[in-house]
Amino acid sequence: MRSKLREVDETDITRAIFSRAAREWADFTESDVIVVGAGPAGLAAAMYLARYGFKTVIFERRLSFGGGIGGGGMMFHKLVIQSPADEILREVKCKVEPLTEGVFTADTAEMIAKLAAGAIDAGTKIVPGIVVDDVMFRDTPLRVTGAVVQWTSVTMAGLHVDPLGVKAQAVVDCTGHDAEVLAIVSRKIPELNIVVPGEKSMWSPEAEKLMLKNTGEVCPGLYVAGMAAAALYQTPRMGPVFGGMLLSGKKIADVVTEKCRALVPRRKQSRRSNVA
């Protein structure tokens, strides 16, 4: 390996970033599936959707991904996974340590890194620093047809800047406790009769069962997984046990596949080409 770095002019750096980023934005402006939120459910959902051949993009409001994984339990760097969700982590070569029969612990940093790598390697495009500000919809028949996106920094600054639209056959709300996409739709498209009452207090075993049960289609074109499902159906929170989150992501990928099979051509299962 060369020890001397090749020089790159400042304008070449700028031009490379603009041109390559613009090329990718132009590509995923029409996607098959938009996953909102790069937490455990969102990363798992995107990984399987991309594996199934769908053109999948994740929009994440932060400049990092992992959602609630990074905080572990009260910032201790471990969390709990129960079977059969450990199989998802094993697929991405994330180590799990047995605790009791069917119960495991995992390292937060490794879980974030391996899940994200799994989604990216499957073909998902993760775009950080983007907030979903609204949705696109049509009324004949009534359905959600995409997401309206904005830079997170613009919304934080309170600037009046018009957002842009990204089309998809399915938008999946994986934004966690706040159920951000569902909250927007409940406010702006009242004819869908969506109400987001928020989650109940902690009851881990029941929370895991109900969240997984309620993962699914909310209305045509709009889906929910992870803690957003708890917020929508007012079921308990579960704390730092993540098996249900991972299985919820896998389930919503299967639900979207079943619903969109006739709408979206099945793509060849291969990795998206790396940008040179």
Residues of each region from the PLM?
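Flavin (primarily FAD) binding-site architecture
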Residues: 173-189
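Feature captures the FAD/FMN-dependent oxidoreductase FAD-binding
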Residues: 93-170
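N-terminal glycine-rich dinucleotide-binding loop that anchors FAD/FMN and/or NAD(P) in oxidoreductases
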Residues: 71-95
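A conserved FAD-binding loop/helix module that cradles the flavin
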Residues: 229-264
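Short hydrophobic core segments
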Residues: 34-36, 59, 165-177
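N-terminal Rossmann-like FAD-binding beta1-loop-alpha1 element of flavoenzymes
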Residues: 26-57, 245, 253, 257
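Glycine-rich FAD pyrophosphate-binding loop
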Residues: 50-70
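Extreme N-terminal leader/targeting segments of oxidoreductases
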Residues: 1-33, 118, 151, 198-204, ...
